[in-house]
Structure formats: C-alpha cells, structure tokens
A protein has these predicted regions:
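C-terminal motif of bacterial Sec signal peptides marking the signal peptidase cleavage site
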Residues: 12-15
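Bacterial signal peptide processing site
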Residues: 17-21
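Post-signal peptide N-terminal segment of mature Sec-exported envelope proteins
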Residues: 25-45
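Short, solvent-exposed loop/linker segments at the N-terminal edge
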Residues: 41-50, 184-191
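Extracellular acidic, Ser/Thr/Pro-rich low-complexity tracts
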Residues: 57-63, 75, 198-204, 214-216, ...
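Solvent-exposed loop segments of extracellular immunoglobulin-like
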Residues: 63-70, 219-227
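Surface-exposed, flexible coil segments in extracellular/virion-facing regions
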Residues: 70-127, 230-247
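Conserved structural position at the C-terminal beta-strand
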Residues: 144-146, 261-265
C-alpha cells in the first residue's frame, strides 16, 4: 500500500531549512494560517451539505489596527490545471460576504468567527464516474484587509462526493503539542524537541479511481506546520510524528510567547492546536 505525503510539503522540502524560517514559521504580519472545514467531524462532503469554515489567522505585530474579512464560494475553476484560485467570473459563484474580524486577545492569533458555506445540490450533475468517485472540489476563497491597507488571502477546496459514499474523509485530530515528550505548558529554558501528538487513526486509508477505472489504495500522510512568536525552529514542517527543535532564547518581555501547530492530511482535513501563555 502506497503512502502519499502531502504534495505541498514535498514541493517545499528544499525550503525546510533554518534559513527560510523567518519568512514562514515566525508570526508577525497579517496571515491566514488555516481554514478548517467541518460537518460533524468530516472533511469530505455531500451535495447540499452546509459546511462550517473556521479561519485561523494571525496579526501578531499588527498593533491596534482593525481587520475585515471577505469570502466567496464557487465550483473549482480548475486550480490543479492552472486556473487562479478565485471565484471572480465563475458561473454560479456566491455573492461576496464581508464582515469585521474579532481578533483573538492572545497575541492577535488564533481561530476567529466561523461562517457557513452551502454546497450546491447539483454539483455532481453531469460529471463522469471518475470525478464522481474521487470528488469534485467546491472552492472557498477568504481574504483579510487591515485598516492600514495590509491584505492577505487564502483558499480552501471542499471535496464533494455522493451522499451514498461510505468511509468519507474525516479531519485529523491533533491532540497536543509535545515538548520533550510531554505537553508543552511552560516556556522552555533551552532547546526542546517539539512533536505533534495526533490521535490514532488520524491518517486514514482510502481508495482512489485511476484514469483507467482501476482502484488504487492510498494512505494519508500527516504533515504539521509550526508557527512561533519567538526563537528559532530547525524545521517548520514535520511529517507524521517527526520532530523539530525549538530554541526559544530568553523569554520575551514584550509579549506572551505561543506555539501553534496545524496538521493537514493532504485531502482537506485539518486540525490546529495553539499553546499560549507560555
């Protein structure tokens, strides 16, 4: 049985070095860290489902500026074959919904207001058997704009398969962030090994239909992305139960340190845990 590690990590392995970390794992400016979708724990949906989207964002060094969000949804225009991740001009796209973002109190980082997306009941109509079995993507775009003009954007693809399908993908469960094998609860005095503690069964096995109609067995590969407000990491992404070493340095006096982990299963499933008040 083949194991498929999330493509975004494979493509970035050349960048998983300390030289790149300040550009990615260090929290500072306005960022969308994850868009977690959920419907009863599932990360794979059926036509007509209403899906809850919970953004995880950070504006750690944003001061007192205010943030406005906007989102839109549409059938995926073909991102995997080069289309831009946008709903602009896509037939059947929803209207753009905007609103003020209530930023988390803790260092302006964490989960913010959930919004609901309704998947069209006709999304699978006219699709060929391979598309129906493997799933059709429903695209959700999400953007943020700060009162001083700073902007950022992200997107989420919701995998949609028939309601009769069994064994649909579920979100992984990131139970805890470990430091030296125990729960990270205090600011370390020196270098520690960080590890994501995912619940058993979070990496699921599934089948996918190939272009010739044959079935292929696969197993998800869990990838955890790490974010920090101080110190340095040796890796900003770890695979499965791999470790990254965190050298926190002296405890900062200008903010309360935090560490955030986001686990992805490569099929749209996401789980996030933040350790604050360290």
């Amino acid at each position: 049985m083949k194991k498929f590690v999330s493509f975004f990590c494979l493509l970035s392995l050349v960048g998983c070095s300390a030289d790149d970390l300040p550009k990615y794992s260090d929290l500072g400016g306005l960022r969308v860290l994850a868009l977690v979708s959920d419907n009863g724990g599932f990360a794979e949906y059926s036509p007509g489902d209403t899906v809850q989207i919970t953004p995880w964002i950070s504006d750690f060094k944003g001061g007192t500026r205010t943030i406005e969000s906007s989102w839109q949804a549409c059938i995926d225009p073909g991102i995997t074959v080069g289309a831009d991740p946008t709903c602009t001009g896509v037939p059947g796209a929803t209207a753009v919904t905007t609103g003020a973002v209530a930023l988390p109190v803790t260092e302006r980082t964490g989960s913010v207001g959930t919004f609901s997306v309704s998947i069209p009941s006709t999304i699978l109509d006219g699709r060929n058997p391979i598309e129906v079995y493997n799933g059709v993507n429903y695209l959700v775009t999400y953007s943020l704009k700060a009162s001083d003009g700073a902007t950022t954007a992200s997107f989420k693809r919701l995998q949609v398969t028939p309601s009769t399908k069994t064994g649909k993908n579920r979100n992984p469960t990131l139970n805890d962030l470990l430091a030296g094998g125990t729960s990270l609860t205090t600011f370390p005095s020196g270098e520690v090994e960080l590890r994501a503690s995912n619940a058993p069964g979070s990496a699921e096995s599934y089948t996918r239909m190939k272009n010739d109609g044959a079935m292929e067995n696969r197993t998800e590969g869990l990838v955890t992305t790490w974010f920090i407000t101080t110190g340095e990491l040796t890796l900003f992404r770890t695979i499965e139960d791999g470790i990254t070493k965190w050298t926190p340095g002296s405890r900062p006096t200008d903010h309360t340190p935090l560490v955030l982990g986001v686990t992805r299963d490569g099929r749209g499933g996401i789980s996030a845990v933040m350790k604050s008040g360290l």
